[in-house]
């Protein structure tokens, strides 16, 4: 029997194009992406967690949604359905493309040398790239749904679709990535 995400989408055909993210993006076939924190005991175990669950966890990160995992998984499932209807592609593949396009490759860090602090450009680890991408996608969806007729699921679907196309005008996550990389480039 073939296991599909939410009983609908096959994750066997999903490919990660970015070689640095391959070992950190988990698209292992699961029926319901809910591990109940099993992968939070060790440092890099979150890379074993399914990306759909990590997205749901990031959506739960604000005050009014804390702990409402079932509601958040329903929102993510609805968003994936909307993505499938609009793009006619596997929504998990669209999510992977969005993560690749919205994770910054370099950032700045603050270095103090002789009492003078300045910014220094540094490369970003693949794990941090993914964390930043998840955070920006979730933040962009929740901000665009605030005081809007659209539901959070519709806004999340829009954000993922625009991020997968690397649309800087419409995607909050891609805009934030470009902003961080621009600041890092000026700090070289």
Swiss-Prot record:
InterPro entries in the record: Ribosomal_uS7, Ribosomal_uS7_arc, Ribosomal_uS7_CS, Ribosomal_uS7_dom, Ribosomal_uS7_dom_sf, Ribosomal_uS7_euk/arc
GO terms under biological process: translation
Keyword Membrane carried by entry: no
PROSITE patterns: RIBOSOMAL_S7
One Gene Ontology cellular component annotation held by this UniProt entry: small ribosomal subunit
GO molecular function: rRNA binding; structural constituent of ribosome
Pfam families linked to this entry: Ribosomal_S7
Keyword Chloroplast part of the UniProt annotation: no
UniProt keywords, alphabetically: Ribonucleoprotein, Ribosomal protein, RNA-binding, rRNA-binding
Summary of subunit composition and partner proteins: Part of the 30S ribosomal subunit.
Chain's role: One of the primary rRNA binding proteins, it binds directly to 16S rRNA where it nucleates assembly of the head domain of the 30S subunit. Is located at the subunit interface close to the decoding center.
NCBIfam families: PRK04027.1, uS7_euk_arch
Family, as annotated: Belongs to the universal ribosomal protein uS7 family.
Identification of the protein by name: Small ribosomal subunit protein uS7
Organism of this sequence: Methanococcus maripaludis (strain C7 / ATCC BAA-1331)
